Curated annotation (Swiss-Prot):
SMART domains: Tubulin, Tubulin_C. Signal peptide: none annotated. Mg(2+) binds at E69. One of its GO terms (biological process) is microtubule-based process. The gene is tub2. It is found in: Cytoplasm, Cytoskeleton. One of its GO terms (cellular component) is cytoplasm. This is Tubulin beta-2 chain. Pfam families: Tubulin (PF00091), Tubulin_C (PF03953). Tubulin is the major constituent of microtubules, a cylinder consisting of laterally associated linear protofilaments composed of alpha- and beta-tubulin heterodimers. Microtubules grow by the addition of GTP-tubulin dimers to the microtubule end, where a stabilizing cap forms. Below the cap, tubulin dimers are in GDP-bound state, owing to GTPase activity of alpha-tubulin. GTP binds at Q11, E69, S138, G142, T143, G144, N204, N226. InterPro entries: Beta-tubulin_BS, Beta_tubulin, Tub_FtsZ_C, Tubulin, Tubulin/FtsZ-like_C, Tubulin/FtsZ_2-layer-sand-dom, Tubulin/FtsZ_GTPase_sf, Tubulin_C. Keywords: Cytoplasm, Cytoskeleton, GTP-binding, Magnesium, Metal-binding, Microtubule, Nucleotide-binding. Its cofactor is Mg(2+).
Length: 446
């Protein structure tokens, strides 16, 4: 069985994680104590992708919950699914990282990291065939970004051949939670580029937009946002957990989605999203799902793919879906919007089908796109970073924890390189022979 070890770090990571486990437990027919009371054999068949079976039919999430302060953990423990998790897997410090990346990465986080790795090791050793790790964190805070990336590199050292998927909540364009967000995010991206295999970029503002515009919620709470994220996370791993005609897993996803090793930052989307009142007025069909899935308003990261081009993308359909219909729709999308796909990758779209839809829906689809327009996101953070860094604002908080200014400069240039790489492949055409013009006469002489 292809097991996944799930690590949630920081406040944001733990809250998204809590929503995710609620979604997954529901799909597998588990109640809030981890006792199975589902209706279908299929729910049990691959339970152990995310759950360990404990004594007397209790299933326990293979989750490691990490934070540098006990507050969020207590909230998770007191929440509706708090009794689900194994108590040993809660690992928290008492000091908090105070939105400071250096604290999470070098001082406070570094003290806690060995404890976390012990638990991760224990969980990994209990697996038959470990597929990889999923990490949820935000890039704006201290723990999720600093300690999350520290864990990422430590786990990478120890399990170099396992997949690393991160769900990273990136800073929003207009709404900022913390002033030093650009610093924390840039330092994190610097790590993610090197150590992650797939990074799914999510941002709160795009989620708010979806909640207000599509789901028609007047004042969405974080719970609603986390629900959207957990729908996508469930969709991405659905093929591991339920049988389907076309399977995909984290590794297949990476092979099909990452044309160049550094360009592994994806946009995600989910369909069908309808407001509660409008359910009865829409038929959920494959064309309808496809249209909504490729709609820029449905993307959960604030960058518009119409400003760039897709290198690759992947669509995962769930439910009773005809294979042929999906293929026709995908071909249709590529032919109609050919300008949005790079022409030097002929078949950009990977599809996966899974027979079991999410709870309460007949069919659904999850979209993952590797678009060059994600550079907007990094550009935006980079501009904010350089504005602050030029004046060395807030820098003493980081240097006080033992960081060097060089690290900031390195992180900044690494992120700028990433942006220019995306730009380069966005502009690349299929017949670029300009570079070889000087050499042409030589061939003629031969």
């Amino acid at each position: 069985m292809r097991e996944i070890v799930y690590i949630q770090t920081g406040q944001c990571g733990n809250q998204i994680g809590a929503a995710f486990w609620q979604t997954i437990s529901g799909e597998h027919g588990l109640d809030s104590n981890g006792i199975y009371n589902g209706s279908s054999e299929l729910q049990l068949e691959r339970m152990n992708v995310y759950f360990n079976e404990a004594s007397n039919n209790k299933y326990v999430p293979r989750a490691v919950l990490v934070d540098l302060e006990p507050g969020t953990m207590d909230a998770v423990r007191a929440g509706p699914f708090g009794q689900l998790f194994r108590p040993d897997n809660f690992i928290f410090g008492q000091s908090s990282a105070g939105n400071n990346w250096a604290k999470g990465h070098y001082t406070e986080g570094a003290e806690l990291v060995d404890q976390v790795l012990d638990v991760v090791r224990r969980e990994a050793e209990g697996c038959d065939c470990l597929q990889g790790f999923q990490i949820t964190h935000s890039l704006g805070g201290g723990t999720g970004s600093g300690m999350g990336t520290l864990l990422l590199s430590k786990i990478r050292e120890e399990f170099p051949d396992r997949m690393m998927a991160t769900f990273s909540v990136v800073p929003s364009p207009k709404v900022s939670d913390t002033v030093v967000e650009p610093y924390n995010a840039t330092l994190s991206v610097h790590q993610l580029v090197e150590n992650s295999d797939e990074t799914f970029c999510i941002d709160n503002e795009a989620l708010y937009d979806i909640c207000m515009r599509t789901l028609k919620l007047n004042n969405p709470a974080y719970g609603d946002l986390n629900y959207l994220v957990s729908a996508v996370m469930s969709g991405i791993t659905t093929c591991l957990r339920f049988p389907g005609q076309l399977n995909s897993d984290l590794r297949k996803l990476a092979v099909n989605m990452v044309p160049f090793p550094r360009l592994h930052f994806f946009m995600v989307g989910f369909a069908p999203l309808t407001s509660p009142g409008a359910h009865s007025f829409r038929a959920v069909t494959v064309p309808e799902l496809t249209q909504q899935m490729f709609d820029p308003k449905n993307m959960m990261a604030a960058s518009d793919f119409r400003n760039g081009r897709y290198l690759t993308c992947c669509s995962i359909f769930r439910g009773k879906v005809a294979m042929k219909e999906v293929e026709d729709q995908m071909r249709n999308v590529q032919n109609k919007n050919s300008t949005y796909f790079v022409e030097w990758i002929p078949n950009n779209i990977q599809t996966a089908l899974c027979a079991i839809p999410p709870r309460g829906l007949k069919m659904s689809s999850t979209f993952i796109g590797n678009s060059t327009s994600i550079q907007e996101l990094f550009k935006r953070v980079g501009e904010q970073f350089s504005a602050m860094f030029r004046r060395k604002a807030f820098l003493h908080w980081y240097t006080g924890e033992g960081m060097d200014e060089m690290e900031f400069t390195e992180a900044e240039s690494n992120m700028n390189d990433l942006v220019s790489e995306y730009q380069q492949y966005q502009e690349a055409g299929i017949d670029e022979e300009e570079e070889y013009e000087d050499e042409a006469p030589m061939e003629a002489e031969e």
